[in-house]
Swiss-Prot record:
Subunit structure: Component of the F-actin capping complex, composed of a heterodimer of an alpha and a beta subunit. Component of the WASH complex, composed of F-actin-capping protein subunit alpha (CAPZA1, CAPZA2 or CAPZA3), F-actin-capping protein subunit beta (CAPZB), WASHC1, WASHC2, WASHC3, WASHC4 and WASHC5. Interacts with RCSD1/CAPZIP. Directly interacts with CRACD; this interaction decreases binding to actin.
GO MF annotation terms: actin filament binding
Keywords on record: Acetylation, Actin capping, Actin-binding, Phosphoprotein
GO cellular component: cortical cytoskeleton; F-actin capping protein complex
Annotated family: Belongs to the F-actin-capping protein alpha subunit family.
InterPro entries: CapZ_alpha, CapZ_alpha/beta, CapZ_alpha/beta_2, CapZ_alpha_1, F-actin_cap_asu_CS
Protein name: F-actin-capping protein subunit alpha-2
PROSITE patterns found in the cross-reference section: F_ACTIN_CAPPING_A_1 (PS00748), F_ACTIN_CAPPING_A_2 (PS00749)
Pfam families: F-actin_cap_A
PTM sites of type Phosphoserine: 9
Function noted in UniProt: F-actin-capping proteins bind in a Ca(2+)-independent manner to the fast growing ends of actin filaments (barbed end) thereby blocking the exchange of subunits at these ends. Unlike other capping proteins (such as gelsolin and severin), these proteins do not sever actin filaments.
């Protein structure tokens, strides 16, 4: 191990550490960070060299954050990244600084975003918040209105998680939906992601995603929002149902095939008669 450490440059050590951090399971960032910190044994090198990994993890995971003085949480995503460690809260029309390591929001200030699309953004957000409240008990959503390549674009992000460290599992749901405001009809593009880590009697991760495309009729803001939510609800329900059915199938077939039904002797041990077996006598005499 000592020879290996001597062969690795600081740059290589940081690259490896950053990869561990970026791939940390949901809810386990601190545990992975602390382990990497012990392995690297150089706090300054870790903080400076792997800072991009801290940021990338939060952006990829749609990390929710509470801003002091405001009721609703906001998601940390690439769509709200204003640069220099600042992020947008479109609902409250503020920007704030975000510490990617501590996961804390500070210094909220007024911020004016795209006013031309604000009425559309607000309508979509109102409908999406109602949907998230109904379907995701711990869900958070953030809706952005941006001009991309000259087109007014809505981007809706949803995050919901369950962290059950005491029960040895953690999981997170993420979905992202995007469409442009155009006459008559437009195309909705979505991506749904599930990541679950179970580690009580083993180390198993589920990492799954699905891409969605559908057409959306564009009329007024309120009606368009209703039609958009119908698409979101149908796609997310179908995906979650498919995941559940696949797991049931694997439980009934694949997982059972991994475990031998009988010992190599092809006979089961009668635990009530264990003392009459030679091994039982040996255990008694031990």
């Amino acid at each position: 191990m000592a020879d290996l450490e001597e062969q690795l440059s600081d740059e290589e050590k940081v690259r490896i550490a950053a990869k561990f951090i970026i791939h940390a399971p949901p809810g386990e960032f601190n545990e992975v960070f602390n382990d990497v910190r012990l392995l690297l044994n150089n706090d300054n090198l870790l903080r400076e060299g792997a800072a991009h990994a801290f940021a990338q993890y939060n952006l990829d995971q749609f990390t929710p954050v509470k801003i002091e003085g405001y009721e609703d949480q906001v998601l940390i995503t690439e769509h709200g990244d204003l640069g220099n460690g600042k992020f947008l809260d479109p609902k409250n029309r503020i920007c704030f600084k975000f510490d990617h390591l501590r996961k804390e929001a500070t210094d909220p200030r007024p911020y004016e975003a795209e006013n031309a699309i604000e009425s559309w953004r607000t309508s979509i957000e109102t409908a999406l918040r109602a949907y998230v409240k109904e379907h995701y008990p711990n869900g958070v959503c953030t809706v952005y209105g941006k001009k991309i390549d000259g087109q007014q674009t809505i981007i809706a992000c949803i995050e919901s998680h369950q962290f059950q460290a005491k029960n040895f599992w953690n999981g997170r749901w993420r979905s992202e939906w995007k469409f442009t405001i155009s006459p008559s009809a437009t195309q909705v593009v979505g991506i749904l992601k599930i990541q679950v880590h179970y580690y009580e009697d083993g180390n198993v991760q589920l990492v799954s995603h699905k891409d969605i495309q559908d057409s959306l009729t564009v009329s007024n803001e309120v009606q368009t929002a209703k039609e958009f939510i119908k698409i979101v609800e149908a796609a997310e329900n179908e995906y979650q149902t498919a995941i559940s059915e696949n797991y049931q199938t694997m439980s009934d077939t694949t997982f059972k095939a991994l475990r031998r039904q009988l010992p190599v002797t092809r006979t089961k041990i009668d635990w009530n008669k264990i003392l009459s077996y030679k091994i039982g006598k040996e255990m008694q005499n031990a």
